[in-house]
Amino acid sequence: MKPPAACAGDVVDAASPASTVNHLRWDLSAQQIRALTTQLIEQTKCVYDRVGAQNFEDVSYESTLKALADVEVTYTVQRNILDFPQHVSPCKDIRAASTEADKKLSEFDVEMSMRQDVYQRVVWLQEKTPKNSLKPEAARYLERLIKLGRRNGLHLPQDTQEKIKNIKKRLSLLCIDFNKNLNEDTTFLPFTREELGGLPEDFLSSLEKAEDGKLKVTLKYPHYFPLLKKCHVPETRRLLEEAFNCRCKEENCAILKELVSLRAQKSSLLGFHTHADYVLEMNMAKTSQTVATFLDELAQKLKPLGEQERAVILELKEAECAKRGLPFDGRIHAWDMRYYMNQVEETRYRVDQNLLKEYFPMQVVTRGLLAIYQELLGLTFTLEEGAAAWHEDVRLYSVRDAASGEEIGKFYLDLYPREGKYGHAACFGLQPGCLRQDGSRQLAVAAMVANFTKPTPDAPSLLQHDEVETYFHEFGHVMHQLCSQAEFAMFSGTHVERDFVEAPSQMLENWVWEKEPLMRMSQHYRTGSEAPQDLLEKLIKSRQANAGLFNLRQIVLAKVDQVLHTQTDADPAEEYARLCQEILGVPATPGTNMPATFGHLAGGYDAQYYGYLWSEVYSMDMFHTRFKQEGVLSPKVGMDYRTSILRPGGSEDASAMLKQFLGRDPKQDAFLLSKGLQVEGSEAPAC
C-alpha cells in the first residue's frame, strides 16, 4: 500500500472505483501494523485539519460534510485491517501489535471527535444550508454530527472539553484492556475421567491431556457450557463455575471500578444526571427510568414462573442426590443451574441433548442455514475457494442479489476456538457498505467469529441446539451488515439504535424452533438419516422450558449494568450477588466476581444490556405478525423484511422501520406469550 499524494481525502489504497473490491488484507506483520497505524493517523488528521482551517465563507457541502463522510469510509476500512487481528490472529505478536494499534487509534478517535474547529464549521454549514436542500440521509448525517459534537461537549468551555477528552482517552484504553484480559486468559482445570462423569465420549476425547494424565478443561465456551450442563459430579461443576466467574478477577475488577467512575464524571461534565441517561438519550428507551420500569415490570411478571421452575429443580436435585448417594442441602447453587435446567429439558420434555447434537454436524447446519437465508432474503452465496484470510479454518463467501446478480457483499466464517481468539460469538463489520468518494457503492464485508466445538479425528463438529441458535443469531447480524444500502458509513449495517440492534438477528433465531427449517439443517452425522419427527417436536415444545429463570437472569445482568451506571459507588460483585438473590433466587458463588468477566460492560453495551430484552419485544412482534401469519419461509415476507428492516441500516429511525414492516406501532403481546406469560386484555404499546 502506497500512501496517496499530499493530503487526499482517500486514505491508503482507497481510490479504486470498482465497487466489488475487498480492500481488506490479513497478511500484515506486527511492524507493518505499527507503521500503517501512524500513516493512517497522519492522513486522516490531514483531512480534519483542512476542514477545520476553512474560512467560514468557504464552508460548503463538498468541502465539509462530504469530505468528512469520505474520510470516514476509508478510515473505517483501514482501521479494521489494523485492529481486527487482535481478536482473531493466531500469532501473539500480531495480536499485541493490533491491540496497540487499537489503543493509538482510539486515542486518535477521541482527538478527532473533540475538534471544535471542525464542529464550528459543521454548525455553520447547517445554519447556512436552506431547509430541505439536502437529501434526507445527508441531512440526517449533518444533524448527527452536530448531536455528537454536543455529546462530546464541544459547546462547553475549553477547560471542560479538555477534561472530557482526557477521560474519553482513558476509557478507550481501559475497555481494550478489559476484553484483552478475558481473550488472553488460558486458565484450565485438570480433572480425571471419573470427575467428568456424565460427559459424552466425543467431548472427553477432544480434551488435551495434562502432564499427570488428567484431562484439561479450559474456561472457553465449548468446554464450560457442556460440562455445566452434563457433568453429574457437583464438585467438578462447582470448581469450574467458580473459576469461570473469577477470570481476570483482580485486574478487571480494578478496571471496572475506574470505568464506572470515569463514565459518571464525563456524563456529569456534559450535564447528565447519570451515565445511563447520557447513553440512553440516543436509544429508543431515552431514559434510565424507562429502562428501570421495563425491567421491573417484566421481573414481576416472571417471578411466579421462576418460583415454579426453582421448585421443579429442587425436586430434581433431591432425586439426583438420593440416586447418587450425595447429601441434599435443600438449596440451588450457581453451579446447579445449568445442570438441572438441562435435566428439565431431558426429563420433562424428553429432549436428549446428546442425541440431538448427533443430527447437527457443522457442515449440514451450515449448508441448511445458508440455504434458508438465501431463499428468505433473495440472495446467492458462493464460497471463494482459496481466499486469503487470517487462519486456515476461515472461509470467505461472496453474496449476490439473486434477482439482479449484483454482488452486494462478502462474509468470513471463523467458527472454531483458538488460543488468544475472541471468546464469544459475534459479528464484526469490516468494510461498510456505503457510497465511496467517487459515488460508486463500496462492497460490504463482515466476519462472523464464533467458538463452536471443533471436529476431532473420530467425529465432525457436532453442535448443541443452543449453538445452532447462536449461529442463526450472529449470521442475522452478518445479513444486516451486507443488506443495508445506506449512503453514509455512519449509517451502514448495524449502526442503528443500540436497543434495536439485536432485534433483526433475534427474530431470525425463531427459525431454529420451527420444524421445516430444522429439517433442512439436520442430518445424522454417521448414518445420514433425517432427525426423527418426535425428537424435533419435543425440542420445539421445550422452547419455554426454564423461560422464567433464563429471562430473570437476563434481567439480573441488565440491572447490574444499570446500577453500575446510575449509582457510581455501587460495588459490582455485591450488586450482582444482591440481584441474583432478589430476582433469580439463586445466590452468586461466594468469592466470585461475575461483573469482572462481563465483556459487555467494556464492549459498547454500557448501560445497554437491557437492549437484548427490549429488542426482543420487536423481534417477536415482527416474527409473529408477519412470518408466522404469512409463512415462516415466505420469500415475499423475507424480501419485505430485507427492504424495510435491513436495507435502511441506520438511515431511518427504528420506530419508522418497524411501523413500515408491521403496518402499525409495535406491541408487547407476542413477546410476553413467548415467555410463557398471559396477555391480559389489550397489552400496552411496546416499551
Curated annotation (Swiss-Prot):
The active site is at E474. Zn(2+) binds at H473, H477, H480. GO terms for cellular component: cytoplasm. GO terms for molecular function: metal ion binding; metalloendopeptidase activity. Gene3D superfamilies: Collagenase (Catalytic Domain), Endopeptidase. Chain P, domain 1, Neurolysin, domain 3. It is an enzyme of class 3 (hydrolase). InterPro entries: MetalloPept_cat_dom_sf (IPR024079), Neurolysin/TOP_dom2 (IPR024077), Neurolysin/TOP_N (IPR024080), Pept_M3A_M3B (IPR045090), Pept_M3A_M3B_dom (IPR001567). Its main location: cytoplasm. It is found in: Cytoplasm. The keyword DNA-binding does not apply. Its EC number is 3.4.24.15. Its cofactor is Zn(2+). It comes from the Eukaryota. Keywords: Acetylation, Cytoplasm, Hydrolase, Metal-binding, Metalloprotease, Phosphoprotein, Protease, Zinc. One of its GO terms (biological process) is intracellular signal transduction. The modification Phosphotyrosine is found at Y278. It catalyses: Preferential cleavage of bonds with hydrophobic residues at P1, P2 and P3' and a small residue at P1' in substrates of 5 to 15 residues. The modification N6-acetyllysine is found at K257, K538. The modification Phosphoserine is found at S16, S172. It holds the Pfam family Peptidase_M3. Binds 1 zinc ion per subunit. Involved in the metabolism of neuropeptides under 20 amino acid residues long. Involved in cytoplasmic peptide degradation. Able to degrade the amyloid-beta precursor protein and generate amyloidogenic fragments. Also acts as a regulator of cannabinoid signaling pathway by mediating degradation of hemopressin, an antagonist peptide of the cannabinoid receptor CNR1. Belongs to the peptidase M3 family. Monomer. This is Thimet oligopeptidase.
